Amino acid sequence: MSVDSKEPSSQEVKIEDESNASEDSEVKTASETKSKGKKISIQNLSPAEIIKTFEDAQLGKDLPDVYVGDTVRVGVRISEGNKERVQPYEGVVIAKRHGGIHQTITVRRIFQGIGVERIFLVHSPQVASIKVERRGKVRRAKLFYLRERVGKATRVKQRFDR
């Protein structure tokens, strides 16, 4: 890391460009870096505003509105050796938690007679796509009662207005 004679202010963060490994490597402040073609200035922002700006930049995916009770197909990226493929996982959304960049959905399906639930971080790079197959009509925020039900009792009524 090269030493700069000018000390950065208390709200500037030094970022070294690691792509150039020479001694005269360029030192940038975070206020000068660009994110997705936009220059972000953090000199007058509070730490909470800096975090919010970063999280908003990470939420770039175009994802459909997913509600509890919907049947969804989640494309999960799986890397096997040096290959990468997308494996679909289809089931009913039984819970939604958190919001923003930390949003998760719990998807339940029956596989070979056994109930399987997976929790997906919606904005994770491992989630390639989310497609809503059919909308569900439910009157609860969490559908954990479906765990005790078997067979046709686990069906959710279809909703046509969304």
From Swiss-Prot:
Residues 1-40 are annotated as: Disordered. Pfam families: Ribosomal_L19. It comes from the Bacteria. Keywords: Ribonucleoprotein, Ribosomal protein. GO terms for molecular function: structural constituent of ribosome. GO terms for cellular component: cytosolic large ribosomal subunit. InterPro entries: Ribosomal_bL19, Ribosomal_bL19_CS, Ribosomal_bL19_sf, Translation_prot_SH3-like_sf. The keyword Cell division does not apply. GO terms for biological process: translation. Residues 1-17, 25-35 have a biased composition (Basic and acidic residues). Belongs to the bacterial ribosomal protein bL19 family. PANTHER family: LARGE RIBOSOMAL SUBUNIT PROTEIN BL19M, RIBOSOMAL PROTEIN L19. This protein is located at the 30S-50S ribosomal subunit interface and may play a role in the structure and function of the aminoacyl-tRNA binding site. HAMAP family: Ribosomal_bL19. This is Large ribosomal subunit protein bL19. It comes from Prochlorococcus marinus (strain NATL2A). The lineage of its organism: Bacteria, Bacillati, Cyanobacteriota, Cyanophyceae, Synechococcales.
